[in-house]
UniProtKB/Swiss-Prot annotation:
It comes from the Archaea. Pathway: Carbohydrate degradation; pentose phosphate pathway; D-ribose 5-phosphate from D-ribulose 5-phosphate (non-oxidative stage): step 1/1. It is an enzyme of class 5 (isomerase). Pfam families: Rib_5-P_isom_A (PF06026). This is Ribose-5-phosphate isomerase A. Catalyzes the reversible conversion of ribose-5-phosphate to ribulose 5-phosphate.
Amino acid sequence: MKTSGGSDAAKRRAGESAAETVTDGEVVGLGTGSTAAHAIRRLGDRVDSGLDIRGVATSFASRELAAECGIPLLDLDEAVGSDATGIDIAIDGADQVAVGEGESEVGPLIKGGGAAHAREKLVDASADRFLVVADPSKETPVLNRSVPVEVLPAGRSAVAEAVRAAGGEPTLRRAERKDGPVVTDNGNLVLDCAFGEIADPDALSTTLSTTPGVVEHGIFVGLADEVHVGTETGVRVARR
């Protein structure tokens, strides 16, 4: 489920900071969520001023916003196919970011509050550089929020049992504006799985990834190259 917290001004500073690193001719992965939306809008402004880029959307929502902002779009297959140059940079938000000593270390993330984490991970992992944008409310010493797990509809019960066996408590994500569950852009369901403090995100990531019926989960380990954290006065950048 989506997280709240952090001012819109802080989110805007983070998103715009990452957008300013994009250079002419690049293919850009366009993330999902309120902070990533600020990056998309800033990129749209830069396109209006002559920046030559192409975007790869991570969700229906980011595709719609990019189109509104005048950013030319590619499908993922067009961007990473055998005749393509690849994705140069991806900019995406996070629901929680583990920070290291002195808030300068890039740690693992939890994503998927918008139920787009399967495509987000595909795009973000394909990029040469992956920049995370967030506000301070998303920072934590240890990941502890529920992990979104996208599952095949037929595998919901089996995956739920596997999550319980791994020490988690799964909850089917319900839609807010219609009866029934959330259905992802891929036609699947989402289990929000509470594990408490996640001492070993890498191990849990492996466990979930190897569970039959799991399409993708929201733990991102070792993917982020930079984290841009917007504050009330500026932007703090951590680099790997």
